[in-house]
């Protein structure tokens, strides 16, 4: 035993002996269990020494676990003991064996997930897909099951909601799990409308397909029989392969996972798109100083999802970057939490940090420490504040329950529930008088006369029944058929206090269904009385009993016994309540309230109420009083700081008012909701049913309670006239109209409520859109109607009424704007108005009506009517109808005269869609299952680009119809299109990636779609080659277009009011016009090439239309592009030809300005040439003709480039005055000043002034006494300047400053007559020299050059710093097509767009976006105690 007892020592043994054998049991593990286990291990031929370590226990567990299923009880006990021991070794606390086993299970599950993840990351998972689009049928063949409409719909919705944000990629990946290329193309096609994105995607797919073909060359020779061909790039993209081939590749042995490969290509493309739409790196996500932590976490994870990294790297980012990039307030808290904190803990800890409440809390803590003493000192002024006491029993202030004289309330005083007393209550706040005990949620509601008691409004309420109370519980009423009484309702949100009349006196009394007797205080009643004692809460009270007293309550009379005595509150007990038919109604409306929050960091709306007219205030007061009675709204006090404006409008065609609340501000601040329904149901998707009913839910929103915590934000105020009293404040208890959450919450409640009914009655179809219900079944009408009543009962139980007024039993049914008949449907009758003048608003309504009608009336057009609305016009502007619009309207009227019907969908038959071209870019289509029985029709007239052709438009129509088919019926129809197969093939070979068309056949309905011309892919040998070009002047709008041919012909035409793009097109048009039936054209315009290569057959541009006409007449045309201005033969010549007089004429208007400037500043020719765009010849001519400048010709000064901190100083003399000149050697920049005397003091002062303006490191002077003086040395020492001296008597050592002195004197001479004093002329000359003379290095002026030199110097130094720092970084990177991160490599250089790295002695350039740069923390990284420092990239 001794040997084995050493398995656990000290602390571990203590922990072992605390663990129970079974949960809740008394027996615990002892040393004997370890000894037993070691003996047992020997029996199983396992080494007992393994028990001493964690690793050993793990190995034993691995050996024993597989045999547990078949092992004996002893084996299981042994396994359990070892699992517990394994956790004791790891110092992980477990309370009993079961907990240890659960932990093990969890650990193994996690491990399994990781390994699965790893295998998935390594490559495409083996075996068949996870989503199972490919299934094995009973014969063992692999068959394809196409993507479900739900999947496609989800995908479309993702793109609509998220555009191309990072979440799109994981969503795509999940939705397309295991899909074939054909499925993937279907997915892409459903979002084909996003053309720019699809174009980018297409380019990526093309590149990847080309790369695939390069890496997988075709094997020579025929394919051996029985062997499959290898897929090419276009096969993988699903364009040149059939579905059968794709399945065969994916399921062969070994498989070629074409679906996964194509998916990888698409994801590469989506990555590019995402980067374009939201270019954010995870390193840039930093928490703002006042940003709530929750928002920061949302942004962080949103970006993290988009990062292309393995799970490990992402895990690392979460652990380090999340904390690191938090703001200082949150970072302090997060660091205190320690490294192992979960995200939940972090969120909780950082809640409210940085916000005003957080600051206030910190301030309050500080204040409480500082001011506690001060408050105590002032205490003598008053004898401590008395705490106001309140009675638990009656709710009045001033006494406690023990001394209360009111009748004793039953149940707990704190929560109001029976079955326990207050001392045992678990509830925290006293809640007795808000009797919302049984139902924590929900509200009272209005009940119409037909409503029954089973109606269950959503809260406990008292109902006082009117009329003949002798009816036993008004039984007839209960059936919902009897008299139509409207009961007063008293909700229990406040105490049910009413005004009663007793013996002609008015009193307030509490309706108390828990009291047997009626007890009143302080009232004198006539007649005899008997003394009586009754038991109350505070003991017994003496009362006088009066019999046969008449009381009037809520307009109902009752006669009975009344007790008069010292009761704290007047009580009407059951003896009276039963007489007036008062009942307590418990709701059965457990509609759960949906919890709603504001957006993080936002507060409720605080919008002031605007003034209202008297009649509106009256109307609103009435409406709100009514709503309050019904429990839809409640009054609130001034403690609620929120407000939303309210106003009133007249109802349509009525004198009644409607209350409108302007919830725009609250809507901005409310969280977002997922719209439960993505669109409106369409009748063409309904299956034909024998019996149909249409119902409408009454007061839909007001039947659903609003989350209690959210109600305060819906507060609004009814103002008073002339502000004579404060406004009345209310808040909503139910879903308000106009609030953004109402539709989603109502619909989800409705779905939950209908679910049990749908389950019980699967044969009944219920379409629910908001409060419209369509119920169809194949039952005979009697049974059907019985089911309808069941449904109405079911809805009533939840508090939803279905008013008879809107209950449609007989066809035709009006539903959602449609008219439904038993075997056909149409849109509700459409009346087009006849008007003499039309406003913008009228035309908008007209177009809306026609669009609505077009879903069943084929041939409706609105193009010309829409044209009338172009431009920004006011709604009331009158618009004259054009002749085309008149004609279009007349045609539409004709079409609408004959009523047209659609039929219903039969799932057993195929869907067929037929498309016709109507001309003028308008298309019409019909979807049917049997000829001449359309399910629905539609039109398409959207032009996506300025230049288009019919084939392109046809593909757009097909995509629209396919999407519609998926949404309504869940499948794509077969298409019948007016285009020949050959025409389609020609177009499609060029454009297959951008367009996908499902199964289709040719149908000969003119006009047929055709390609009118074709461009050659190779130059035409023997045809004349035209080099074309155009140029235009932006200011004058004048231009030229022309060509030169390889046969020496040339032509140029002048154009007015044109642009560069137009002239390029004009030149092509000239070439086509002047050439034979075959022609080669070379242009340098990408714009023109792009338009013509897309084969347009119509365009909004007149010139493009002319080009199209010319192209149609040619036999063969080849069009090619060359880059401009690259000296390419014919292109360069034609460029010169069209440019003369256009591009170079521009300098003429610059000459005058240049001459004017030269007269002022005498700038040199280089400065003028660059500032005024003058040719050098002209600029030199200006200098030559100036009498002051041609004396000595141009000064030459090409400096030697010296280090940036050196200046030369010297004194020169002019007009008997001393000028001190400093020159920046490297740039030739001058600072100069007239000084009173040549002394050390003046020189020192000048040097300090210079050092304050520029970085001066070294000054170079001659040996003059002023420069060698002690004062100058002191100034140089203070400013950190090194002083150097020239060689005595050798003026060349001061060469730079000497030549500058000459130059300066020359300039002073040129401007001297413009200034009175020499010192002014010196500064003018300095300005001219520094900024008006260009030349030397870089053709800069001296001022530009000094700035450039200093900036370059700073950058170079920074770079040096970076290079030394950069050694501390490591780079993780991805190669061109491999998605796995490699590294770490050494960082050699980091630029804007790329980084240079060293990976195993190989130097690589990696695009910036494919590299992650991480600080290298050395070996300690591995330790637990490592605290990572800054992670950003320098």
From Swiss-Prot:
Transmembrane segments: none annotated. Residues 488-492, 536-542, 575-587 are annotated as: Dimerization of protease. Mg(2+) 3 binds at residues 1210, 1262, 1298. GO terms for molecular function: aspartic-type endopeptidase activity; DNA binding; DNA-directed DNA polymerase activity; exoribonuclease H activity; lipid binding; RNA stem-loop binding; RNA-directed DNA polymerase activity; RNA-DNA hybrid ribonuclease activity. Residues 14-33 are annotated as: Interaction with membrane phosphatidylinositol 4,5-bisphosphate and RNA. Residues 1200-1350 form the Integrase catalytic domain. The active site is at residue 512. Residues 449-458 have a biased composition (Polar residues). Mg(2+) 1 binds at residues 696, 771-772. Residues 8-43 are annotated as: Interaction with host CALM1. Residues 630-820 form the Reverse transcriptase domain. Residues 12-19 are annotated as: Interaction with host AP3D1. GO terms for cellular component: host cell; host cell nucleus; host cell plasma membrane; host multivesicular body; membrane; viral nucleocapsid; virion membrane. It catalyses: Specific for a P1 residue that is hydrophobic, and P1' variable, but often Pro; Endohydrolysis of RNA in RNA/DNA hybrids. Three different cleavage modes: 1. sequence-specific internal cleavage of RNA. Human immunodeficiency virus type 1 and Moloney murine leukemia virus enzymes prefer to cleave the RNA strand one nucleotide away from the RNA-DNA junction. 2. RNA 5'-end directed cleavage 13-19 nucleotides from the RNA end. 3. DNA 3'-end directed cleavage 15-20 nucleotides away from the primer terminus; 3'-end directed exonucleolytic cleavage of viral RNA-DNA hybrid; DNA(n) + a 2'-deoxyribonucleoside 5'-triphosphate = DNA(n+1) + diphosphate. Residues 1020-1143 form the RNase H type-1 domain. HIV-1 lineages are divided in three main groups, M (for Major), O (for Outlier), and N (for New, or Non-M, Non-O). The vast majority of strains found worldwide belong to the group M. Group O seems to be endemic to and largely confined to Cameroon and neighboring countries in West Central Africa, where these viruses represent a small minority of HIV-1 strains. The group N is represented by a limited number of isolates from Cameroonian persons. The group M is further subdivided in 9 clades or subtypes (A to D, F to H, J and K). This is Gag-Pol polyprotein. The lineage of its organism: Viruses, Riboviria, Pararnavirae, Artverviricota, Revtraviricetes.
